[in-house]
């Protein structure tokens, strides 16, 4: 397996965590999203993903884009350990939780959106406030949902004592939130999960600072 990745891409970060949880061997092919006008726009990568986005997982003569689709593929390729809770209600909740991040929070502070704002003459302060607004709005809903499932302090991860797709999606989004000085004290349950996950090898090894393309 080859993962086209950028060290700071939240979506690529999700997939790296999932690959590590499943203990699947893979190699990284870095795609720098800023260098040389963005390597994702170069013709050779455009052939791999016409959307010009990372991540892309190449395996069995397939180029699979979209982090959630990649994780679904990994689940089919190697069912255990699963990225989903055994409990049906928690499985549905983890999918809902992941989609809230991947569809409603992350796209609004993706690099190409922020670049569009900057090209529209938005200041750095404007861009930061934009990111903070949408992350805070999303995290407020996530905190409400997850805290209701942890009324008895059940489980160290989002849904129980095993990492799931929800944790794969949450940790990169919190990492991104901290880059923009979002106050995580407002989200104690999310932050508790984040702190626990940071200490786990599968998450630690997937972190931006551990990637070969992380700048010295």
Question: Where would I find each of the regions flagged by the language model?
Answer:
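Alpha-helix N-cap and coil->helix boundary residues
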Residues: 65, 89, 185-189, 205
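GST-like fold's C-terminal all-alpha helical module
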Residues: 101-199
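Short Asp/Glu-rich motifs
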Residues: 37-39, 196, 216
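Conserved beta-strand edge residues that scaffold enzyme active sites
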Residues: 32-35, 191, 211
């Amino acid at each position: 397996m080859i993962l086209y990745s950028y060290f700071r891409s939240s979506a690529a970060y999700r997939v790296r965590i999932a690959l590590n949880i499943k203990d699947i061997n893979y190699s990284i092919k870095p795609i720098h999203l800023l260098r040389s006008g963005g390597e994702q726009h170069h013709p050779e990568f455009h052939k791999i993903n016409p959307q010009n986005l990372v991540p892309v997982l190449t395996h069995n003569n397939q180029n699979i884009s979209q982090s959630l689709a990649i994780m679904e593929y990994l689940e089919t390729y190697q069912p255990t350990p699963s990225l989903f809770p055994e409990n049906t209600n928690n499985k549905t909740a983890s999918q809902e939780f992941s989609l809230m991040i991947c569809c409603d929070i992350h796209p609004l502070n993706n690099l190409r959106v922020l670049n569009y704002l900057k090209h529209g003459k938005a200041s750095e302060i404007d861009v930061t406030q934009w990111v903070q607004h949408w992350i805070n709005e999303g995290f407020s809903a996530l905190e409400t949902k997850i805290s209701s499932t942890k009324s008895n302090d059940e489980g160290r991860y989002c849904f129980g004592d095993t990492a799931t797709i929800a944790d794969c999606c949450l940790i990169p989004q919190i990492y991104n939130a901290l880059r923009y000085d979002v106050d995580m004290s407002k989200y104690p349950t999310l932050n508790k999960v984040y702190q626990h996950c940071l200490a786990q090898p599968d998450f630690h090894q997937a972190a931006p600072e551990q990637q070969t393309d992380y700048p010295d």
